[in-house]
């Protein structure tokens, strides 16, 4: 009886680990700004429109690509975002290829470490949804719009039951691809789970 209980516990633990890894495999990596990357944008709404095109969820990550000798990325509070205050960031990155994992729901605020660049709208806010059910944007749950840069008013949300999205310029390549490392991990986990199950059943 004790042996059966131990086998059941091992199977349960293996299944739990497998499910956690499979959920992680659905995480996506978004290259900020698409092919253009993290730089002073050509217009005041470029990063807002980029953020509105995607639905960010817990476990996803943002990839900032930039010239490390000319720019950096600061994660900041909303007040610092609004005022382009670079003095006290919550996190600072300057490696030229920064990946930031979105590990909780709610807003994330990013600005350029170069204050002049931030004032030229090199700043980004993304809203992370808590749900990872696989449902994409629907009329019943439209994505939250990113706030407009300071000095500009944000468009009002639609009043009716349907919503309209203003077409935004699309990047030349789609950069929101599944995390390949996580996909590999899920495959390895499946193999380990099968090996564990066969070992338990053979004994």
Curated annotation (Swiss-Prot):
Residue stretches spanning the membrane: none
Membrane association type: Lipid-anchor; GPI-anchor
GO CC terms: plasma membrane; side of membrane
GO molecular function terms noted in the UniProt entry: electron transfer activity
InterPro entries hit by this protein: Cupredoxin, ENL_dom, Phytocyanin-like, Phytocyanin_dom
Expression sites by tissue: Specifically observed at the plasma membrane of sieve elements in vascular tissues of leaves, stems, roots, flowers and reproductive organs. Absent from companion cells.
SUPFAM superfamilies registered for this protein in UniProt: Cupredoxins
Annotated glycosylation sites: 103
Subcellular location as annotated: Cell membrane
UniProt entry tagged with the keyword Lipoprotein: yes
Disulfide bonds: 84-118
Residue ranges listed under propeptide: 181-203
Keywords: Cell membrane, Disulfide bond, Glycoprotein, GPI-anchor, Lipoprotein, Membrane, Signal
Listed PROSITE patterns: PHYTOCYANIN
Limits of the Phytocyanin domain: 28-130
Primary role: May act as a carbohydrate transporter. Mainly required for reproductive functions.
Protein's recorded name: Early nodulin-like protein 9
Organism: Arabidopsis thaliana (Mouse-ear cress)
């Amino acid at each position: 009886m004790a042996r059966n209980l131990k086998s059941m516990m091992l199977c349960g633990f293996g299944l739990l680990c497998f499910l956690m890894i499979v959920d992680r495999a659905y995480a996506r990596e978004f290259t900020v700004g698409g092919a253009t990357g993290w730089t002073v944008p050509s217009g005041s709404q470029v990063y807002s429109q980029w953020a509105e095109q995607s639905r960010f969820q817990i476990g996803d990550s943002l990839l900032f690509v930039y010239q490390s000798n000319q720019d950096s990325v600061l994660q900041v509070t909303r007040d610092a975002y609004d005022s382009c205050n670079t003095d006290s960031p919550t996190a600072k990155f300057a490696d030229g290829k920064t990946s930031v994992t979105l590990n909780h729901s709610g807003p994330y605020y990013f600005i350029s470490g170069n204050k002049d660049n931030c004032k030229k709208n090199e700043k980004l806010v993304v809203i992370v949804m808590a749900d990872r059910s696989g449902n994409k944007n629907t009329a019943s749950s439209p994505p939250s719009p990113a706030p407009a840069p300071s000095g500009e008013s944000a468009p009002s949300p639609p009043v009716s039951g349907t919503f309209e999205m203003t077409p935004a310029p699309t990047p030349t390549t789609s950069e929101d691809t599944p995390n390949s490392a996580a996909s590999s991990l899920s495959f390895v986990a499946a193999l380990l789970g099968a090996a564990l199950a066969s070992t338990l059943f053979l004994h």
